[in-house]
Amino acid sequence: MSLKYTVEHEWVRPEGAVASVGITHHAQDALGDVVFVELPEVGSAFEQGAVAGVVESVKAAADVYMPISGTVTEVNEALRDDPSLANTDPLGAGWFFKVQPSAPAQIDALMDEAAYAALTGS
């Protein structure tokens, strides 16, 4: 399945029973150079829309929102050592965490690429 997007500029990539989550090119571009990422704890459960982490850049700090309800199954430890991955490969190596959805239908309700492009004007 292709990526889905939120209005808060997170992306979701379904991968079997889990979904990877990160920030979009638009988000990392607006933030500038990312210098720190606070990730959620593995095993933490979140409702859709809850703050799940923080990304800090040279320009600002921004909350990372949980795009779907579920439980965090894995975090990207590489981001702790190299937060710039959120800039250099936001849709790949710069993923933030993986979540096991508690309401998988929420993924279908997120924006597709065309809707997100219309939102961001890109």
Where are these regions (language model features)?
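Acidic, low-complexity mobile loops and tails
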Residues: M1-V54, S84, T88-S122
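Short beta-strand "wing" residues that participate in macromolecule-binding interfaces
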Residues: S57
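Mid-chain, well-packed structural core segment of small domains
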Residues: A60-A93
